[in-house]
Each structure stands twice: as C-alpha cells, then as structure tokens.
C-alpha cells in the first residue's frame, strides 16, 4: 500500500488498504490513509465509514473527530454530534468548547451552548475567547444581565480592549440602562483614543436613548440628544465608519435636530451660556451639551 501511495496509484492503494481493513487491522494511520484516499476520489460515504471505524476503537482521537466533522461540513451534513463528542471527551479544551457552542447557537440551541461554555470556563478562567463567546450566547438568549457580568469579567482580564467595553455598553442599552451604557461607551472612547468605531457607538447610544425617551412630539431635550447623536455619527463617518448611515439620514430628513428656531425659544439666561443641555429624568445621565452654531 505504501508503495502504491508513493507512486500516486490511488486505486491500487485503496484496494490494498481495503484488504488490510477486511483483515480487521486497527492501525489508525493505515485507516486514516484509506479515508483520505476515499476523500480524494469523492467517495464521502466510504470516507465517513472508515473514520467512524477508527473512532469505534479510538473514541477520544480528537484529530479523527475533527477530520470527520470537516468531512460532514464539506458534504453539507450537520456535524453537531461530532463536535459534541469531541467536546465531551475534552471538556477542558477551550477551542473544542467554543466550536461546539457556535454550532449549537447556529442551530438555535442557546441554553445548551451556555452550559457547554460555563463548563469549560471552570477549566479556562483566563481564556478571553470563552468569556467573549459566553457573553454573546447570553446576549442571544436575551439574558443581558448575565452577558454584562461575563463581559465585565473579561474586561478585568483585558482592560485595554475597547470592543469589550462597547459590548458591555450595548447590553446595558438593551436594558434601557443608558447611564451605565454611557459610562462604558466613554471608557471605550478613552481606550480607543476616539476611534471611529467608538464614536459611532456613542452616536447610536444617543440615538437609541432619544427614541426610548421621546414622546409623539419632539421636545427641545429630545432634539438636543438627536443633535448629539448626529454629531457623533458625523465624526465617525469622517473617520471612515458609516455603520449607522441610515440613522444619520433619518435624523437629517425628519426635522428632529436642534436648530436656530429652537435656540431662539430658549430663555435668555440659557442663551447667554452659548450651549443647551438636555433636561428631564430620562436624560439626567447626559453630561454633554449642544453648542450654539454661528448662524443661530
């Protein structure tokens, strides 16, 4: 068989390997070569059968488990059971846990994904990717408080990761906790040194807060927050991030930005300061102001 393999005579090699297989040989390398040869010829069913045979006497062989999963995926079949077996045989392996959890989430089995990740976290309590994937699973499960706790633990491990701060902020936004969301968004902005992604996130935070707080008619405070959102969207766009271009366009087209007419409706003592701040309990976390424009 080895001679045929060296000569590139695949058919002859397969015949020889099949003869060895029929003899009951349990040599993993031999059977793996046979599986590869089947794969080269597109004989997927036979390839799967041989790989499964290897696992029947060597069930913890992670390399064969991975190979079988790859074959399943390339043939369009669901390899979930393979990923599950590999994870259960190696619960301390973070990569296997993450891959299995991702497959579960793709199938909508979020609770099972969370269980798998929490299990492996006991072995990998300093693995950033486990925390990040678990945080995403909690978020998909609408368990935003647990997502926040998990991501805060991750932030303690990686305090210079502005994207983790943004994710924590996003989960607070899901709970309409805009004060906490702003605190984490500000951290992201400081860590990233005002990069485009962090700027666009704060713009979206203001945009969502405005929509959560406003009534049927836009108050001056609603318009002030809308203008803050617009300002951040514009800054992010200037740095190449147009993620929220639809929201920015909506603000432009719906007469919700604080403008000249709104300015002249303000009390004189506010006009004297040259800026206006949002007011009201819903906006009591907003510390920024809208500055008077030159044409007001």
Regions found by a protein language model. Name each.
Residues 27, 61, 93, 127, ...:
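Residue-level recognition of tetratricopeptide repeat
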Residues 1-2, 6, 16, 29-36, ...:
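Canonical tetratricopeptide repeat
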């Amino acid at each position: 068989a080895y001679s045929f393999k060296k000569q590139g005579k695949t058919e002859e090699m397969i015949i020889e390997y099949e003869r060895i297989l029929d003899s009951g040989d349990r040599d993993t390398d031999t059977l793996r070569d046979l599986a590869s040869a089947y794969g080269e010829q597109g004989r997927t069913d036979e390839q799967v059968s041989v790989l499964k045979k290897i696992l029947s006497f060597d069930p913890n062989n992670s390399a064969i488990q991975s190979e079988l999963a790859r074959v399943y995926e390339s043939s369009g079949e669901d390899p979930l059971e393979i990923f599950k077996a590999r994870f259960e045989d190696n619960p301390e392996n973070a990569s296997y846990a993450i891959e299995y959890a991702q497959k579960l989430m793709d199938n909508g089995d979020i609770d099972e994904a969370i269980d798998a990740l929490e299990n492996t976290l006991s072995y990998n309590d300093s693995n950033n990717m486990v925390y990040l994937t678990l945080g995403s699973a909690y978020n998909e499960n609408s368990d935003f408080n647990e997502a926040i706790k998990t991501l805060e633990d991750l932030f303690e491990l990686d305090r210079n990761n502005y994207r983790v701060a943004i994710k924590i902020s996003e989960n607070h936004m899901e709970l309409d906790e805009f004060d906490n969301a702003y605190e984490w968004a500000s951290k992201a902005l400081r860590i990233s040194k005002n990069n485009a992604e962090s700027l666009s996130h704060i713009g979206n935070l203001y945009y969502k807060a405005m929509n959560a707080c406003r009534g049927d008619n836009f108050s001056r405070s609603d318009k002030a927050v809308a203008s803050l959102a617009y300002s951040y969207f514009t800054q992010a766009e200037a740095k190449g991030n147009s993620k929220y271009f639809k929201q920015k366009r909506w603000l432009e087209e719906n007469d919700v930005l604080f403008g000249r007419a709104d300015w002249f409706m303000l009390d004189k003592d506010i006009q004297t300061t040259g800026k206006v701040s949002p007011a009201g309990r819903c906006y009591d976390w907003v510390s920024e102001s809208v500055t008077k424009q030159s044409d007001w």
